[in-house]
């Protein structure tokens, strides 16, 4: 099963990704993780990526594609993988298609988690994180038993500086401008599965599994 997971910031991709990789026994491939690993190991691609990141610049498509295709060429991806955070735009999607075609394989499904912008903003603005253990809460949807105190370790909860309405709205707009066109791109290939992400977590996962089927 070869899957791409799409969805705006705050759509719950991280939560659903855990369930997907467990159910289908495939590696979870995140571009952020790939960048960090290559930089840490000092690979040639990692060094090039670090040069851009140190300057606060976006890593060019060509370099990002190189890192991802290198990762999905590895043995543990032989029977499938789930891409999260890639492709970010249609150009990256086209590069990926060329690579997969040359490798004699194809994508099975692109899971697109859809959530209304107002809900995405509400989710992010209400998020609270434990300073000690990193547990995540939400003032409305998943509040701690005691306000401002972590249920797990009794650590102090805080709000991330970028979890404000203005910053979150900008992140969503970047997604809409850059990544949303991928939905049309994959729709034309007939492999998109639109999933309503404003439902209960279990229901969202149930819908994803129904769209993916039994796997290969």
Swiss-Prot record:
PROSITE patterns: ADENYLATE_KINASE (PS00113)
Class of the enzyme per the UniProt entry, highest EC level: transferase
Record-listed Zn(2+) binding positions: 130, 133, 150, 153
InterPro entries: Adenyl_kin_sub, Adenylat/UMP-CMP_kin, Adenylat_kinase_CS, Adenylate_kinase_lid-dom, P-loop_NTPase
EC number: 2.7.4.3
Keyword hit for Zinc: yes
CDD domains to which the protein is assigned, alphabetical: ADK (cd01428)
One GO cellular component term: cytoplasm
Stretch list, region NMP: 30-59
Catalyses which reaction(s): AMP + ATP = 2 ADP
SUPFAM superfamilies: P-loop containing nucleoside triphosphate hydrolases (SSF52540)
Keyword annotations of the record: ATP-binding, Cytoplasm, Kinase, Metal-binding, Nucleotide biosynthesis, Nucleotide-binding, Transferase, Zinc
Residues covered by region (LID): 126-163
Protein localization: Cytoplasm
Residues at which AMP binds: 31, 36, 57-59, 85-88, 92, 160, 171
One of the GO biological process terms: AMP salvage
Sequence positions that bind ATP: 10-15, 127, 136-137, 199
GO molecular function: adenylate kinase activity; ATP binding; zinc ion binding
Gene3D superfamilies reported for this sequence: P-loop containing nucleotide triphosphate hydrolases (3.40.50.300)
Domain of life: Bacteria
Pathway of action: Purine metabolism; AMP biosynthesis via salvage pathway; AMP from ADP: step 1/1
Alphabetical list of PANTHER family matching this protein: NUCLEOTIDE KINASE
Family under the similarity heading: Belongs to the adenylate kinase family.
Domain notes: Consists of three domains, a large central CORE domain and two small peripheral domains, NMPbind and LID, which undergo movements during catalysis. The LID domain closes over the site of phosphoryl transfer upon ATP binding. Assembling and dissambling the active center during each catalytic cycle provides an effective means to prevent ATP hydrolysis. Some bacteria have evolved a zinc-coordinating structure that stabilizes the LID domain.
Function: Catalyzes the reversible transfer of the terminal phosphate group between ATP and AMP. Plays an important role in cellular energy homeostasis and in adenine nucleotide metabolism.
Protein name, entry field: Adenylate kinase
Annotated source species: Clostridioides difficile (strain 630) (Peptoclostridium difficile)
Source lineage: Bacteria, Bacillati, Bacillota, Clostridia, Peptostreptococcales
This protein's encoding gene: adk
């Amino acid at each position: 099963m070869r899957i791409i997971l799409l969805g705006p910031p705050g759509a719950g991709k991280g939560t659903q990704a855990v369930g997907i990789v467990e159910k289908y026994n495939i590696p979870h491939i995140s571009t952020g993780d790939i960048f960090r690993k290559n930089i840490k190991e000092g690979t040639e691609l990692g060094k090039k990526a670090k040069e851009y990141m140190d300057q606060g610049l976006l890593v060019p498509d060509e370099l990002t594609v190189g890192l991802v295709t290198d990762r999905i060429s590895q043995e543990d991806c032989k029977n499938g993988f789930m891409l999260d955070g890639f492709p970010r735009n249609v150009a990256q999607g086209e590069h990926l298609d060329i690579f997969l075609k040359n490798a004699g394989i194809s994508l099975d499904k692109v899971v697109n988690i859809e959530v209304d912008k107002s809900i995405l903003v509400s989710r992010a603005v209400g998020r609270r994180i434990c300073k000690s253990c990193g547990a995540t809460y939400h003032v409305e949807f998943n509040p701690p038993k005691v306000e401002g105190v972590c249920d797990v370790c009794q650590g102090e909860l805080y709000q991330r500086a970028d979890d404000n309405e203005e910053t979150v709205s900008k992140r969503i707009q970047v997604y809409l401008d850059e990544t949303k066109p991928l939905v049309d791109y994959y729709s034309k290939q007939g492999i998109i599965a639109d999933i309503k992400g404003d439902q209960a977590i279990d229901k969202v996962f149930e819908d994803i599994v129904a769209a993916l089927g039994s796997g290969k």
